[in-house]
Curated annotation (Swiss-Prot):
ATP binds at residues 30-33, 51, 87-91, 415, 495. The lineage of its organism: Bacteria, Pseudomonadati, Pseudomonadota, Betaproteobacteria, Nitrosomonadales. Gene3D superfamilies: GroEL, GroEL-like equatorial domain, TCP-1-like chaperonin intermediate domain. It is an enzyme of class 5 (isomerase). Its EC number is 5.6.1.7. Pfam families: Cpn60_TCP1. This is Chaperonin GroEL. It comes from the Bacteria. GO terms for molecular function: ATP binding; ATP-dependent protein folding chaperone; isomerase activity; unfolded protein binding. Keywords: ATP-binding, Chaperone, Cytoplasm, Isomerase, Nucleotide-binding. One of its GO terms (biological process) is protein refolding. Together with its co-chaperonin GroES, plays an essential role in assisting protein folding. The GroEL-GroES system forms a nano-cage that allows encapsulation of the non-native substrate proteins and provides a physical environment optimized to promote and accelerate protein folding. It catalyses: ATP + H2O + a folded polypeptide = ADP + phosphate + an unfolded polypeptide.
Amino acid sequence: MAAKDVRFGDSARHRMVAGVNVLADAVKVTLGPKGRNVVLDRSFGAPTVTKDGVSVAKEIELKDKLENMGAQMVKEVASKTSDVAGDGTTTATVLAQSIVNEGMKFVAAGMNPMDLKRGIDKAVNAITEELKKISKPCTTSKEIAQVGSISANSDAPIGQIIADAMDKVGKEGVITVEDGSGLENELDVVEGMQFDRGYLSPYFINNADKQMAIMDDPFILLFDKKISNIRDLLPVLEQVAKAGKPLMIVAEDVDGEALATLVVNNIRGILKTCAVKAPGFGDRRKAMLEDMAILTGGTVIAEEVGLSLEKATLQDLGRAKRIEVGKENTTIIDGAGDGNAIKGRIAQINKQIEEVTSDYDKEKLQERKAKLAGGVAVIKVGAATEVEMKEKKARVEDALHATRAAVEEGIVPGGGVALLRAKAAAAAIKGDNHDQDAGVKIVLRAIEEPLRQIVKNCGDEPSVVVNKVLEGEGNFGYNAGTSEYGDMVAMGVLDPTKVTRTALQNAASIAGLMLTTDCMVADLPEDKAPAMPMGGGMGDMGGMGMM
């Protein structure tokens, strides 16, 4: 086992704080509308340029083991805030740095670290409650656009395209971000439920221009097994033919004489049909068929529940206003399912999302939820170069997370103003002793720090601006983008409540752990023995020349 470097007391804390400051100083230059870029080296290809705090934090690894432990703990603040709220990583880092540095001064003065931590926790709880009171619901498209643009470093077009996407697919709908092919950002919306399976035979195509099978007001047969024998299918085909409607078949597979008969009927115009494979595999396929059944008001014909294909009736079939089937995708538009049943299914999927631990499973469940909720929007990010594309794409993803957080918990005035307005609630808190009061004071100083850093990145004097904002009330604050004072909400400078709350709670949590640390243990660097010199006579291998 390798020897360890064990440090106690101030010796340990000083090294840890040094690591905290290196990481936080690198991250905080990105804060605010006039935040600076950070360039990250890559082992191959062009370097990455970013204004995303968590991207900068993830790159930092320090040579000194003890300093690195401090840096990694603050990195955890940024990562956790990003995971929960999707934004606010730089704010969380700035808050953590301030609480740690202020707290260490009191610890060095001989105060009890545990009481300091209790005081910090009391102040944070009071501020969190005050933020909830200040918070307003984020409902309008304009507010969503404003939140998105602030999170994307004051890029208004990004905020607008996210607001448009949410208008199209709803606040519960899935919005994905992809690389675009041009210079401008584009928004593609797929309405209804789309899955990645196409027609089983090109003979089902009835629209030559689009190379698609398009059916209006069809019946939809959902079957969880393979269909090869046409006799099993005949009773359903006869009932649908009498009704004079097209038929869409979604099954594990359709082949042999069953597929041949469907194709012949389709070509002759006897019965307009189309067959596709069910999406997914195993249990996920069953779940997606069940989703389709709920969306279309039909039933999955499955032997497990005592249903068979021969005995299926029109009541077992789903309905939709329109179905479009391409070579690789099928879209069900305006299914005839019951609205309450669809909401119930979405609630059930939401519960599963909370319980699963795998990111892959979570992503697949969110896709299913989106398909039920009414569509998928794809934002295609345009840029002139690949470096710009990566940077812009990261900002769009940040903005998307921020708008979702705003819809979930509401909005507060941005630019660090909400924390300052919550200051009075924390100032009224009295600790059980003098040391706890000092913990409250640490937080009161720390919550000024985000605004100070925003102003500093603008090149202005932080203390002057902070004092002027504190003299005002309500939404009065400093718009760093335009260097103007005024109503932050009216100027469209908004932050999601969830982002501000999460940033403060995570910062206080990690900072509290650091203040109560009294010992650090790290591996000592090993002294590697020098390499063995080459053996004698091997130098120039002179005797090996050709005669």
